[in-house]
Protein backbone atom coordinates (compact mmCIF):
# COMPACT_ATOMS: atom_id res chain seq x y z
CA UNK A 1 0.00 0.00 0.00
CA UNK A 2 0.18 3.11 -0.06
CA UNK A 3 -0.61 3.33 3.63
CA UNK A 4 2.00 4.94 5.87
CA UNK A 5 1.84 4.27 9.60
CA UNK A 6 3.70 6.53 12.01
CA UNK A 7 4.52 5.18 15.43
CA UNK A 8 6.69 6.41 18.27
CA UNK A 9 9.37 4.00 19.39
CA UNK A 10 10.81 5.21 22.66
CA UNK A 11 12.12 8.66 21.76
CA UNK A 12 12.67 7.69 18.16
CA UNK A 13 10.04 8.42 15.54
CA UNK A 14 9.91 5.66 12.96
CA UNK A 15 7.73 5.25 9.92
CA UNK A 16 6.66 2.18 7.96
CA UNK A 17 5.51 2.39 4.37
CA UNK A 18 3.27 -0.44 3.33
UniProtKB/Swiss-Prot annotation:
The keyword Lyase does not apply. Keywords: Fimbrium. Its main location: other. GO terms for cellular component: pilus. It is found in: Fimbrium. Fimbriae (also called pili), polar filaments radiating from the surface of the bacterium to a length of 0.5-1.5 micrometers and numbering 100-300 per cell, enable bacteria to colonize the epithelium of specific host organs. This is an alpha-galactosyl-1,4-beta-galactosyl-specific adhesin. This is F7-1 fimbrial protein. It comes from Escherichia coli.
